[in-house]
């Protein structure tokens, strides 16, 4: 596996490869990331991964400086998965001058849910993903469904810019107790780690309530509020539990809900100092 930091060197290395499968990451790789590499191999060849902790998507009070950086360990894991190239640029490689041009997602998708609680987050995500796409020029890119809103935003960006890239969604990988694998799980204390699966169980409770309800009579706002209250009673600080349409992440109208619109429930909540996100399709 070649480890490359320069955009030009990456382009030179991939010249003539017409079915690159690309997996962008921020490193500190776990089994969830490695499952993306395996899925990428099913859709293209060669597989190219990137590791870059992107300052543009971190807010002023977020964990950019303490975000775990484990490059050597990550390299060994990617080698074991048969990845062809790892693109691991420095900040200077990616942003040799101030990044004055940004990709700003539409407000109806970028300023809700995560975008409401992390202003500017998706602008940073879209900007770096677009730059990574222009560097690697893939035909396939794999994104995990754990970051459901990010997946939707990237998919729409690719469509509206007419990029010749197939976006492949990957199912969330979970621990045996249901907790979605995340690099931020390492911040949890032992007691918090024991409590953390409650987030996924709460999503299941919401799904069961919706599926078992009379859709014509059920108020989704009440279901969402009850789920937030359940988490709060257990010591969580929920930002949201929100039931949305899978198609565009807008709230369903009562008529759409009653007609059986495909839905997804998304959540973000703090447990101690650690903010976790998760989702479940209904």
UniProtKB/Swiss-Prot annotation:
Its main location: cytoplasm. SUPFAM superfamilies: Nucleotidylyl transferase. It is found in: Cytoplasm. (R)-pantoate binds at residues 57, 150. Its EC number is 6.3.2.1. CDD domains: PanC. It catalyses: (R)-pantoate + beta-alanine + ATP = (R)-pantothenate + AMP + diphosphate + H(+). Pathway: Cofactor biosynthesis; (R)-pantothenate biosynthesis; (R)-pantothenate from (R)-pantoate and beta-alanine: step 1/1. GO terms for biological process: pantothenate biosynthetic process. Keywords: ATP-binding, Cytoplasm, Ligase, Nucleotide-binding, Pantothenate biosynthesis. Gene3D superfamilies: HUPs, Pantoate-beta-alanine ligase, C-terminal domain. InterPro entries: Cyt_trans-like, Pantoate_ligase, Pantoate_ligase_C, Rossmann-like_a/b/a_fold. GO terms for molecular function: ATP binding; pantoate-beta-alanine ligase activity. It is an enzyme of class 6 (ligase). The keyword Nucleotide-binding applies. Beta-alanine binds at residue 57. HAMAP family: PanC. Belongs to the pantothenate synthetase family. Homodimer. The reaction proceeds by a bi uni uni bi ping pong mechanism. Catalyzes the condensation of pantoate with beta-alanine in an ATP-dependent reaction via a pantoyl-adenylate intermediate. This is Pantothenate synthetase. It comes from Cupriavidus pinatubonensis (strain JMP 134 / LMG 1197). The lineage of its organism: Bacteria, Pseudomonadati, Pseudomonadota, Betaproteobacteria, Burkholderiales.
